[in-house]
């Protein structure tokens, strides 16, 4: 039989693992390309992103565990709150390949806006089950708003690099 703490660890780690796997495009050529883009002065330093995302992913992952546990696992009651969560997580994981891999800054922005909407719906659904679990999503929602604003500014300020055009690297 699995130890009782295993589901909590699994739910907490899944978002980070997915985020890590979807961010492979950030490394190498994607990072080189991004370094050459015009960015606003308030752009966060690259080294801050891993700890920020690690914290956000861990909080949302543990929140999903709280919902799962409160609703008795993958029950019929859990379909909406965990389904919304899975949907926003899939949208979240789609952003790095869109932005860094395909270099589609506009579509990446659309993805971020959709992610924010589904994440907000997730927080509302979670609040009905566990206000604490919902509150674990609040920093993520704030970060998504910041990230969407940053994505928009980078997209707007790099007109010649829209549409996935790849400059010489």
Curated annotation (Swiss-Prot):
Membrane topology, Cytoplasmic segments: 27-46, 101-105, 156-169
Task: Kindly state which keywords UniProt assigns to this record, in alphabetical order.
Answer: Lipid transport, Membrane, Mitochondrion, Receptor, Transmembrane, Transmembrane helix, Transport
Kindly give the membrane topology term recorded for this protein. Answer: Multi-pass membrane protein
What domain of life? Eukaryota
**Where are the Mitochondrial intermembrane topological domains?**
1-5, 68-79, 127-134
What Pfam families has UniProt attached to this entry? TspO_MBR (PF03073)
The residues the entry assigns to the signal sequence are none
Q: Name one GO biological process term.
A: lipid transport
Transmembrane ranges?
6-26, 47-67, 80-100, 106-126, 135-155
Subcellular localization(s) per the UniProt record: Mitochondrion membrane
Tissues expressing the protein: Ubiquitous.
List the residue ranges forming a coiled coil, or say none: none
- GO CC terms, sorted: membrane; mitochondrial membrane
Assembly mode: Interacts with TSPOAP1. Interacts with MOST-1. May interact with STAR.
Give the family, as the similarity comment puts it.
Belongs to the TspO/BZRP family.
- Protein name in UniProt: Translocator protein
């Amino acid at each position: 039989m699995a130890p009782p703490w295993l589901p909590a660890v699994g739910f907490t780690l899944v978002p980070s693992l997915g985020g890590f796997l979807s961010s492979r495009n950030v490394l190498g050529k994607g990072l080189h390309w991004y370094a050459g883009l015009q960015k606003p002065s308030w752009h966060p330093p690259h080294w801050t992103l891993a700890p920020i995302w690690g914290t956000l992913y861990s909080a949302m992952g543990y929140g999903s565990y709280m919902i799962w546990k409160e609703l008795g696992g993958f029950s019929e009651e859990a379909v909406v709150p965990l389904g919304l969560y899975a949907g926003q997580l899939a949208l979240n994981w789609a952003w790095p390949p869109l932005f860094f891999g395909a270099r589609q800054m506009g579509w990446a922005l659309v993805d971020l806006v959709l992610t924010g909407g589904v994440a907000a719906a997730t927080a509302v659904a979670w609040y009905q089950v566990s206000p604490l679990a919902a509150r674990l999503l609040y920093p993520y929602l704030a970060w998504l708003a910041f990230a969407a604003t940053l994505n928009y500014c980078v997209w707007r300020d790099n007109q010649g690099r829209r549409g996935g055009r790849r400059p010489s690297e």
